[in-house]
């Protein structure tokens, strides 16, 4: 069915010489911020099988970020853990079903998402272009760090086996998965679907679909900022994080995806350094990336890497 040749496309993304220095400094800043994590039992959502907690923790620029933390009541400790990162227009999940399968689970809500949007809310559309031409204050800086601090939270929980943490998400959640896998070696397995924020300078030429069209809208209004936008994005593009990913990882895409073009996944896979990596490319599928079938592949992947 596919008439494109996404595996032949390549990328225009360039990794800045000071990329590792830039992120090293940000990680140090983040490390120096105490988590100050608090857990509040959610009695309404707690069941006989799963305890549900609303978690609050501190992140960059003193923002208090929120997430859902689910624990199976009857499974032996310490538990393997799975983190679920949200998409761009979707809200955080409450992953009780996976907790019932024997995992400690965390539904992340980085700044701007539900329950973390009173502190920071550029709206939709808006996050993608918020301070787009300034790498030091670009919106995704805090967003990425909020996401990786979930890993820090989990490693501090006595009921979690810090050697068995997996992370996952699709679209923007796939991007956050890639960044967290790159910046947190505690991650032992990762699954990224239809990864967003990957090959961004390529994607804005390949699609006219939102959210990427937000950037094209911005550049139509401010064409003089294109070079500055590209320079900023090179510090945030997932392709430039990929060579730091060492854990087992699966990536899945739809070959007819007009939201996150499949062409951007191939240079990403080329850069990932993990000795155990696999790309699933589904013909006949768009941004859904065949997740209704692939979800079982993901569950099996995590069971194999985190439960054995």
Set out the residue ranges of the language-model regions.
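Histidine-bearing beta->alpha loop at or near hydrolase active sites
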Residues: 279-290, 297, 301
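Short beta-strand element of the alpha/beta-hydrolase
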Residues: 67-73, 77-88
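Cap/lid segment of the alpha/beta-hydrolase catalytic domain
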Residues: 93-145, 202-203, 209
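Hydrolase active-site cap/lid region
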Residues: 178-224
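Acidic catalytic loop of the alpha/beta-hydrolase fold
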Residues: 255-260, 288
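Short beta-strand/loop motif that positions the catalytic acidic residue
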Residues: 245, 251-253, 257
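Gly/Ser-rich "nucleophile elbow"/oxyanion-hole loop immediately N-terminal to the catalytic nucleophile
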Residues: 128-171
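N-terminal targeting or regulatory segments adjacent to alpha/beta-hydrolase or S9 domains
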Residues: 1-50, 308
